[in-house]
From Swiss-Prot:
Primary residence: cytoplasm
Record GO terms (molecular function): DNA binding
Region (Disordered): 194-314
GO cellular component, one term: centrosome
Phosphoserine carried by residues: 206, 273, 275, 294, 416
Positions of disulphide bridges: none
Pfam families: HU-CCDC81_euk_1 (PF14908), HU-CCDC81_euk_2 (PF18289)
PANTHER family tied to this protein: COILED-COIL DOMAIN-CONTAINING PROTEIN 81
Organism of derivation: Rattus norvegicus
Record-given protein name: Coiled-coil domain-containing protein 81
Amino acid sequence: MLDRIGPGFQDLCRQVLPTLPSLSQEEVSTIWGNVSDFVERQLTMHKGVQISGLGTFTFTRQQLEMGNKKFVLVQRPVFIMSEKLVQTHGLKQNKVFSPGDIPVVPLNFVMISLEGPFNRDTIEGCVRETLLFLSRSISIKQNVEFTFKGIGVLSIRDNKVKMRFYKDFLSSVDGSGTLTKALANRPGTMDSVLSSRESFGKRPNSALAFPRIEHKETENKPPVEVFGEEGGENRPRKSKLKDQSDKEEGAWEISSAKKHRDRQSISPAKVTSGSLLDKFERSGNGGKITENLSPGGQRNDNEKPKTSPAPACQDHNKAGQEMCYVCLQRAQRNFALYYGDEKRRREIEDERLMQQYQIAKDQEAFFKSQMKSMATREQNQKNAAYNLGVAEAIRSHKNEKPDFYKSFLFDKRPLSPEINAFKQEEYSQSLLKQMESKREKEIKQRQNRELMDRLEQVQLTEELAAQRAQYLKEKMEETQYYKRALDAQVKNKPSQLPMFEPDSAEPIFGKNEGEMEMEKRKREQSCMKHQMEAAANLKRNTILNQLVDQRRDLQMLQRTKREHLADRAAEVDRVNRLNQCLQEDWDRSLAMKKQRDLEEKAFERASDKLFLLDQCEKYRRCRQCQRRTSNTGESNVWPLNKFLQGSRLLV
């Protein structure tokens, strides 16, 4: 991946990107393949995945119009580019709204490291540095295609972001099979669906592929001999690299279909490992596929294939279990059918029809817009002509009839004819009657108004008289009240001072004041005594309350001390038990380690034929019918009559 960077920038990359230079292309592809598997598993379980620095894989719900006023609600996967990356490089992406009930999990490097031979730091460094290199490639205005294995291809061309998903992935996520058809039939989303064959196509040299995958195994693999039928003669031919890639692609399509069926048969929560296709590709001997195809790719029904006899099947060695003679002949007579070319032709035809439909639709829309503009233009012309005609008519009318006065003054008005004299007399009588009735009505209204004024004056006079009478009455009552009060004061007036007698020994004032002082002093003494008793009781109660509080505090301190001692004892007991459990676990682990060491030593000293798979080499069986490889068609079931050797009986 770093082969396109200049030498000056490579030294800087070794400081900024310490992980990528130490990894090969195959290792980088393997790491991103594991990342794609993790994202695919999470999307299969209807969960979003956020890749820091790149974007988020999630779902969106959309109502698609299927025609004939029918709508279908689909949930399709989408990729939302990171906002920081979009703002930094000025990228353009369709705005997509994702519902909030779909959980989004971050990229878990620990789970990815458990699935491959790389540790967590290596995977995280590879992902981060690859995204840094991707950001630099975008910054220099270079076209980029980022391939996610099993998911789709993220392409950035002319600062436009587009994510195209594989049909197999959409089918596995949807489960109903309607999502792919709905997206492929709509003009807005038809370019979001990508077939698996298009992903293997040759990319333009101007686009930078992430992560780069070099097919070294395909280039270094020797040509495979394929036996086919050509002109009725049996002869082997060597397939070229292009034919071999087509066959591998056909096998890929069949395997992907099997993967789709297997994935639909299980629930999303149980998918915890890689797909069946990845397991099939990682297997050493199972990855080689022998295909028997005719040179022309077609077979006639009346022609029988002619194959060269082989003593044993050399391409199906699985744990020593070869194919028997019968299964081998059946396998050689069968030929594989690949629908890759037909599927590609069908897709090309569908794309052509879709383009024709789009062109026809655009032409129809353009024709409708032209017709609408022409109709609008004609209507505007009609309105302008009508307005012009109205203006001309108004102008001509004004010119024909100029303004004139509506009334005239005649100096000598001629007399009215005698025919209208009777009507004029009636009109004059009616006018006189109206004038008389109007005059009577005014007189009556004036009389009523005067009467109402007089009534108001009389009523006001009565109210004033009543108020004055009430005022006089209240004044008389107040005078009587003051008079009674003065009479009571005069009546209750105290006695006069005693007469002064000179040289009198008896006191004149304060003769009866001693008894009152004695009573007052007694009251004060009793009050003071009561107050002293209350103060003493209050002081005694305060002292008792203080003693009770001190005793309660002392009891609380003693209880707290006992609880603290009990907690310390329990903590010491817990620590002792924990130490004892740890010591027991250590002893148990030590014993298990010793046992494992003994088992490993015994295994190393054991013979090579210890496992059942090693012993299966002695007993070769056909992998299809489970019979011995020397089977030539005989049956294990005895017939109704069988001749026994050395006997005259027929059983």
